[in-house]
Amino acid sequence: MVSHPMEKAANGASALETQTGELDQPERLRKIISVSSIAAGVQFGWALQLSLLTPYVQLLGIPHKWASLIWLCGPISGMLVQPIVGYHSDRCTSRFGRRRPFIVAGAGLVTVAVFLIGYAADIGHSMGDQLDKPPKTRAIAIFALGFWILDVANNTLQGPCRAFLADLSAGNAKKTRTANAFFSFFMAVGNVLGYAAGSYRNLYKVVPFTMTESCDLYCANLKTCFFLSITLLLIVTFVSLCYVKEKPWTPEPTADGKASNVPFFGEIFGAFKELKRPMWMLLIVTALNWIAWFPFLLFDTDWMGREVYGGNSDATATAASKKLYNDGVRAGALGLMLNAIVLGFMSLGVEWIGRKLGGAKRLWGIVNFILAICLAMTVVVTKQAENHRRDHGGAKTGPPGNVTAGALTLFAILGIPQAITFSIPFALASIFSTNSGAGQGLSLGVLNLAIVVPQMVISVGGGPFDELFGGGNIPAFVLGAIAAAVSGVLALTVLPSPPPDAPAFKATMGFH
């Protein structure tokens, strides 16, 4: 285990605190694998969030142009929760360790959130929602509360899990790469399981009581998926934390005999004031990258149901239109499963491919252009689907096979740049924080702001922006393609290259 005493930076006036001291030997590989497995449980639930919850909230009665607002809670909680959790997990003096208490708290919050989301329709109906009169305002309120708690829980889990792996690796380059390779692998496992569950039409039969008067087929499947998700998360978390112990951490006293203690917000703002040019460039490229990614991550399955399959998710839509939409959403979940498989294999090859292409920044720049091309190709797939419906009188059976295959191919190819997005920015942040002596938790929290601020912008403006250009999802996808291209140019031209022997080059991490 790593024991990091906290010391003031050398100039004495710094708002950043550094973590220094003797490093213990890295832990055994089986313990690293055990902690990495928590990523499968977290990512199972995150996959369900991405694939099923945007369509579901529209079925409850929120119009498409406002559906993205439900995601606003995610960036806000990420902006506040992850840096705060990172800060306090770096300093936690619990007898159970620095990271484990936060992981347990996060798993408990996920459990609460899952029940609120899964039973939102049932609770709303019991409180007075009419089954045939949308919008179901009470169900929407319960759903939004659960959604908010779920995002807080995910952010409470993710940061300490990442930091725990760094602690277990004890600064050893080989163990760091190995630990994060396994973290990446289990992320892919969770994604595949989550998207596979979301694509299966009759999953509710595994838990038949999930279908009720107020919870239809789609709702029952979603409820069952989340039950499976929380079961997996609780099992892997319990096993990992019982097996892998942490040493309690004690802060090193300062010259006056007291432990150093800088107020959190003073430290976080101080971190921004002291950022060097490499970190600023990383934040800019990361922000543009997420402006490109987030519209697609929010609306990929909605795009399949609405533009590709020609369905309608509005609460007042016909049963036939809703069926087409649900078929498209399930096809989108299948596409996301293919995406997760490609992401998993690509993650294992990031380090090797990066070396062959001449470094991390060149690899990131190249895959950002792949992202831009794929987002632009959604326009082509959409036009082909629209032409088919026009030529076949509305095509109530969905798109032809070649259109569906084209859409699924885009999902799969996008796994390549997504693997890089989940790895290189976090690896570079770890490298820069190591060079400056800043705590891993705080540094990853600062990088997280470059992810959540674009998410907030898209959550607030995505729906109205689409509506301004005629509705649907394509306008935001085109904007994303432009942002991806700009991000690629900046990654190749202004982003500094990390040292070739950087220990955390392959630090693959998730996001929330």
From Swiss-Prot:
Report whether Transferase shows up as a keyword of the record. no
Record: glycosylation sites: 402
Q: Which UniProt keywords apply?
A: Cell membrane, Glycoprotein, Membrane, Sugar transport, Symport, Transmembrane, Transmembrane helix, Transport
Protein's UniProt keywords contain Metal-binding: no
Instruction: Report how activity changes across the pH range.
Output: Optimum pH is 5.
| Cited Gene3D superfamilies | MFS general substrate transporter like domains
Q: Which residues lie on this side of the membrane: Extracellular?
A: 53-65, 122-138, 199-223, 300-332, 384-407, 462-473
What do the Gene Ontology cellular component annotations say?
nucleus; plasma membrane
Tell me which tissues or organs this protein is expressed in. Answer: Expressed in leaves and, to a lower extent, in roots, flowers and stems. Highly specific to the phloem, exclusively localized in companion cells (at protein level).
Q: What InterPro entries does the database record attribute to this sequence?
A: MFS (IPR011701), MFS_trans_sf (IPR036259), Suc_symporter_pln (IPR005989)
| Reactions catalysed | sucrose(out) + H(+)(out) = sucrose(in) + H(+)(in)
Major location (coarse): membrane
Q: Which residues lie on this side of the membrane: Cytoplasmic?
A: 1-31, 87-100, 160-177, 245-278, 354-362, 429-440, 495-512
| Pfam families linked to this entry | MFS_1
Bilayer-spanning residue ranges:
32-52, 66-86, 101-121, 139-159, 178-198, 224-244, 279-299, 333-353, 363-383, 408-428, 441-461, 474-494
GO terms in the biological process aspect are:
sucrose metabolic process
Entry's Gene Ontology molecular function annotations: sucrose:proton symporter activity
Protein topology in the membrane: Multi-pass membrane protein
Regulation (activators, inhibitors): Inhibited by protonophores (e.g. dinitrophenol and carbonyl cyanide m-chlorophenyl-hydrazone (CCCP)) and SH group inhibitors (e.g. N-ethylmaleimide (NEM) and p-chloromercuriphenyl sulphonic acid (PCMPS)).
This molecule's function is given as:
Responsible for the transport of sucrose into the cell, with the concomitant uptake of protons (symport system). Can also transport other glucosides such as maltose, arbutin (hydroquinone-beta-D-glucoside), salicin (2-(hydroxymethyl)phenyl-beta-D-glucoside), alpha-phenylglucoside, beta-phenylglucoside, alpha-paranitrophenylglucoside, beta-paranitrophenylglucoside, and paranitrophenyl-beta-thioglucoside. May also transport biotin. Required for apoplastic phloem sucrose loading in source tissues (e.g. leaves) in order to transport it to sink tissues (e.g. roots, flowers).
Record's subunit section: Homodimer. Interacts with SUC3 and SUC4.
Family statement drawn from the similarity comment of this UniProt entry: Belongs to the glycoside-pentoside-hexuronide (GPH) cation symporter transporter (TC 2.A.2.4) family.
What name does UniProt use for this protein?
Sucrose transport protein SUC2
Upper classification of the organism: Eukaryota, Viridiplantae, Streptophyta, Embryophyta, Tracheophyta
